[in-house]
Amino acid sequence: MTVTPLSPSVDTRVLASPVSGPVAGSPSTSRVDQALDTIRDRLDEGFFNDVSQSDLRDINAALNGLTAEERNAVVSELSDDELNKWTDELDNSGFLGMGGGLNVDERRDLYTTLGGSLDATQLERIYNAYDNREQKIELAQGVAAHATSDVKTGFIAALAPQTTEADGMGGVMISDMGDAEGLAVAHVLGSLGGNASALSTAYASLNDTQLSAVFEAGTQQTMYANMQGGAPTYSYDAGPLAAAVDAAATSPDAELKARVFELAGRQMANVSSANGVLTPSVGTGDAADEIRAGMEGLLKSDVNGVVEALEQDYQAGKGMTAFLQETLGQDGGADTIRGLVDQLARGNDLKGDMLQRFTAPTQQDGGVFYPAAERMGYFSGALHQAFEGVNKGAAENVETLKTIFGFATGKLPGPGVGDATGWLSDQVFDTALSQYQSGQADLFESIVALTTPTGADGRRPYDGPAEVSYNEGWESVTRIPLN
């Protein structure tokens, strides 16, 4: 997009502050009518069949002189054709490049005013009046920064049906691949951190297909065509998606967080795998790292709650597998996974006893299951799939497994032990790793032994009714039967 630079001869009157104007109250009919007259007069094209910068600044000034309620009333009185005319002119270079759109700072001031004043219905009307993708996103950023939570959630709900239309835009050389509405929604979702009610309302308005499209757009994939022919290149900037994940991490709702974690993980996997011979891509590593870091923070906010919700709602574990595979490739990634395993074993507060938690039954649907065992099975299955994806070989895998599980050979539960920190006997730990490294056991057998508490005899993993729940969690991800 090309924005017309300001000429030194052009009127550069400073816009009134968006917070100036009459005190809020009932809209004044006379001020609304006067502003409408000004706007319609300034949009009336003159001799050069164009609207000048001065005209557009007069419109801004007219809006700045109103209360929020009056601005909303003014916009509601403008027809769709009038809104289309106004938005077309905001970035119009005019006759011979002498007319005029507003510069980026002036547009930002306008979107600050509109975002903080209009209701969701009028904001959607202005948004849909734009043909220009960049200005759509600028307006959405104004909504994200300045609208009330009710307006933000209404705006998201209004755009939700449009997020799957795949209307990526661009020119011959550079094309934005994601849906504009999806990116707009991603920006607004990222502004809802700390507002549990707004997060719940916003995510409830998006089905999984729509949210996936929003998160895909939030990676800001851009295609660059090659004038000499051959394969195009791609770039990514996942800031909007990462911000949405960070905001979701502040919700107390484990199911909401699990949904965000799962769908963000799928997009991270797509970004991480995008750089290939046929699809050369720039910034995939940084973008994947940014998404992964957000997912880590979200997961750490309630490891047990999120994993339980994932096991119930996303049994294939695609998001968790992608997260763990990306984490294994990070410096210190094994340490991160170790901390997550410890919380799953001993509770989010690290004060529990792994064996007691693992074997604690819960009644459900007339039967009994073991939630801690099922969570550990699900996580362990995803960890196995992540190791398979990284594909480093037995020797290197053993060293990583030592880093992740070595701490679990601490104090084991038993009579008189009130501060047990471990769940693996040295014998079980050493046997699991040595048999895998020597080829006597498969990787999955080693991981199962390391994520199951040592039995009462101290020589072999636990064998009891909780195994059924562990196996269900494991097999839902790996499809590898343990019986």
Predicted regions and their residues:
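N-terminal acidic, proline/glycine-rich, low-complexity intrinsically disordered segments
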Residues: 1-11
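Non-catalytic all-alpha helical scaffold/repeat segments
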Residues: 11, 15-483
